[in-house]
Amino acid sequence: MGLLSHFTVAVLLFAFSLLACLFMNRFFTSEARQIGSVWDQQHDITAHGRLVYNPAKPQNNSSRDIHPERSQKCNISRGSECAIAPESRFDCGRDKLLSQSECEDRGCCYAPLPDSAGPPWCFYPRVYPGYKMGPLIPTPRGQGATLTRASPSYLPKDISTLRLDDIQETTDCFHLTLKDPSSQRYEVHLPGGVPQSKANTQSVLYTTEYQSDPFGFIVRRKSNGRVIMNTTVAPLLFADQYLQLSTTLASSFVSGLGEHYTSLLLDLNWTSLTLWNRDMAPHADANLYGSHPFYIVQEEDGLAHGVFLLNSNAIEVILQPTPALTWVSTGGILDLYIFLGPDPQSVIRQYLQIIGYPMMPPYWSLGFHLCRWGYTTTNTTRKVAQRMHDENFPMDVQWNDLDYANKRRVFTFDPWRFGDLPEMVEEFHKRGMKYILILDPGISSTSTPGTYSPFDDGLKRDVFIKNATGQILIGKVWPGPTAFPDFTNPDTRQWWEDCIRDFHSKVPVDGLWIDMNEPASFVQGSVEGCPDSDLENPPYTPSVVGGRLNSGTLCMSARQKMSFHYNLHNLYGLTEAYATHSALLKIRRKRPFVLSRSSFPGIGRFSGVWTGDVRSDWEQLRFSIPAVLQFSLFGVPLVGADTCGFGGNTTEELCVRWMQLGAFYPFMRNHNDKPNAPQEPYVFGQRAQAAMRSALYLRYSLLPFLYTLFHHAHASAETVARPLFMEFPNDPNSRTIDKQFLWGSSLLISPVLEQGAVELAAYLPPATWYSLHNGQPFYSKGQFLLLPAPLDTINVHVREGHIIPQQEPALTTTASRNNPFFLIVALSAGGWARGDLFWDDGESVDTFEMQNYCYVIFTAGQSQVVSNPLKLNGALDSLVLGGLQVFGVPSPPRYILANGEKVRDFTYRTDTKVLAVTSLALPMSEVFTVQWVF
């Protein structure tokens, strides 16, 4: 054979080799859809860069190919592999700081930048070896496949084989899991479980595509082809204590991933957010009390989607301006839910279908709550409540912090300072008030045996968390050395119920405030320290306050019924809330009230949340709004911040403005720390008192409307305190607003948040908005308006087309619930409006589920308002409509008819076009009509 023939054969062999390489890297099994690189499509990058992998030579010239056979067969220039824009780099050294040689030893690209912060210097090339996906095989709920690695990654204890399950959960929810098929790793099991179903594949709102080698997947919105998730942009890593998954984002408008001290829209400029529950007063760049691995994305055209990673281990989320996001978890599995919406409210509803709809709070819990660490005796506590009553400040619930407890031990009360605590509680009850006290999880372990039954009984019943040697782990909290109940143990939940029952038989509290339940400890891990192990010193620790996972909490090697604390830490508050809610339900046989500091997805089913130890300053006042709105997205509608602040001394002006804003938190409580100046409303000057009193009366007048919103949250997963973007998804201006918010779809709240301000620029989305105070209309095309805001005013506007039920306020909800109702009717340009009222006894369990409630629809049109009671149970029988205001009546009416009878008491203001009808007494349990005749 001649030289030419040899050359021809060589060329043909090379061509076949190259074609084989291209085929293997660009096509899928017969079950999977063929795709190119969505990353390349989105960023206009040459496609051939995704076909091969050719590791760079390290600086020390020692070649360490990860896939040598691939680099030999498909040798394409490394330059294009690393030619990646800085904002689109994905960090190859997240687990540790790497030198250039260490970076290149991993097969990654190294390209320093002038600034030390921001894009990584060590980053993945366009194609990086990882898992290879086998054929997709149908399963009862979708399809599954096996993922294998040809060679290990750079991580210790790499898992070489994974099981992928693609689950078509519902038409609007895609569920994907990645697990180790050879080992039972910890998986989160939410109390009450997660619903399981299978969607009709013909009607789903999404399509899925898989890249087989290296593995990645893409989720698209079926209606427009938009990429919702694309994980082909960076490698999947799955080791025993390090799980990493990256994805592009459909837009830069991202919210969620709490609990953090942030704006509502997250900063995507190389921001790192750690999800690891910690006793930490809110401040920037800190992991706080709760962990919620859920985010919602506002897409450019007003559509929205959400993503939930069901994982309770320590998680770090890296946001970058690509826009893109990287999940890094220290354990568990990858259990992803993608919610297709298509609108923001639907995304939240779909999310709550997985984690559970929120509980229905008792009506009284929507009133004003007052607390302070420093009410040191029952007499002091009595005087506070009496002074509030004497000064005509509405208040429903008096609280006590740990001052009540004997030697700061829970389930006791101090015999000297709080010896008549039971009598005081009964006095409050006779006045129509409620009483709540704090209940920390830590149980004192140093009392003389036989003198403190919670610990003695807990020892006998084996309910406490153990250390690595099997002994009770002892931490340190307020009473000193303490043991911690293991709420994942059913025996512990029964013991907890017994402790609450015994205490409740002496002190009939109406609810419980569960604090310090991250869980918090004043020593690192335990009083004896923690063992040196992979759990205490994992290969990778996210950026946590204190630098270690056991900082300010328990040892990670601590043993609980379900797993190690390493896996369960973020669930502690949720499991305690579940146990406390269940106990109160059985003991009181009424709707439980629980308030928790620590949180995790699903806690809204059992508890409300407050935002922790906020400082008394204007910045914290401002940031309280996005904090409250975040919890609305997380399925926790009963949420609020400590009005006037907890830490530091408030000022009169700050406290007035905070009480005005707090009047529109779904949960309103004034609470502060004992070293600080008192901040009860009555301690301030007369002008400030009048402003605070006005805010409280306004809140109490709106409680029927607020209660109805909570019903819709409980029954339909609607939000109560609502970001503007959820109601106006097609309005670009609404996307960024987090200094204003809505109650439901009807009320727009625009508080003063700056010191010394007497006016504010408020954004009014496209609509006609009426001032709640005087009915003045504002016709907005979606613009900012400068509104007067003197110290006695909070601007609240009613949206056209809505009817707001109100009730004459009183000093307690016990009294106000018997008062006449009133309606605010905000007419649209076409003269119509609609509203509703949910009403029951305010405290019985499952009234909606048991059909034991009243529900009334109000409609306005053709110059009349009509009520239509769709369901009645007697709760409204003695209540009447006392009057109504109609906003937007174009001209003065000649007369008013109520159920066909003329009404004499009415007024009309030509300047604001407001009709006010008074002196009515129309039964709320019957159909009524109020008509204005021109």
Regions found by a protein language model. Give the residues of each.
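N-terminal signal-anchor transmembrane helix specifying type II single-pass membrane topology
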Residues: 2-33
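Extracellular/luminal ectodomains and secreted, surface-exposed scaffolds of diverse proteins
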Residues: 110-115, 899-923
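Short, well-ordered beta-strand segments enriched in hydrophobic/aromatic residues
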Residues: 145-147, 166, 176-178, 205, ...
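Catalytic-domain carbohydrate-binding cleft regions of carbohydrate-active enzymes
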Residues: 3-13, 40, 44, 48-55, ...
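Surface-exposed beta-strand/loop patches in extracellular or lumenal glycoproteins
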Residues: 180-182, 188, 192, 756-765, ...
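Extracellular Cys-Trp
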Residues: 94, 107-124
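Accessory, solvent-exposed terminal regions and/or long lumenal/extracellular loops of proteins
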Residues: 278-283, 793, 798-901, 918-925, ...
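A low-complexity, Ser/Thr/Gly/Pro-enriched, surface-exposed linker/loop concept
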Residues: 129-145, 158-203
